[in-house]
């Protein structure tokens, strides 16, 4: 199957619109991501979200008054995004791929959010094309927010229920080097491996944070519950500790934030 077919199949079988609102791990991921966006995004910024899904972030930012362009690969998600964005004249949504943002000129946006594409890009060429395109369309001094998955969290959240050998073989080779291939659906990275993708690019890392802690794993426990007051306390703890390097691999979702320096990337 082609990558686009794999991604379409994944999101045709799940409710992406509800993921960030109805589960504690999704809520924490959203809270954390928006905290960093609000802390760093200038007023009246022009924002591009690549892999916008159903518009959770694009719609929220447009409602706050930002000028938002959203690009989404999956037709089903795009339809829901447009439905969610009704009445928002400062949000435009188009279908497209993170590896080719040719519809947008160089240095066009104050910030680019790529909060999903790296989950479904499996080859170094595609990783570099997606990152280079995000950097290209960002203004010098602008911000690039890129989400990715921890390969270690994938292993212990998805494969501790009796199929650990399968998960080990799928995510690591015999020498425990991380594997990436399309049939994974979701691909994870070692943190240092992901940071190295930016080597030689005209950017400076300014933050690396985990966004959902261990809640993806915790919710699989029988009887797991996090009532509102307990969740509020956990959020306070999480926001204080989410950049601690030793804890990053325990998060399922991570957020890399960098600032574009002078100079341009090639298309």
Show which residues each predicted segment covers.
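Conserved class I S-adenosyl-L-methionine
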Residues: 1-44, 56, 60, 144-171
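Class I SAM-dependent methyltransferase SAM/SAH-binding core
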Residues: 56-100
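Short alpha-helix
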Residues: 184-202, 208
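A C-terminal cap/extension of S-adenosyl-L-methionine-dependent methyltransferases
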Residues: 207-267
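A short acidic, Gly/Pro-enriched loop at the edge of an enzyme's catalytic core
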Residues: 102-112
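A short glycine-rich, Lys/Arg-flanked "PGG" loop and its adjoining helix->strand segment in the class I
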Residues: 128-140
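A short SAM/SAH-binding and catalytic strip from SAM-dependent methyltransferases
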Residues: 111-125
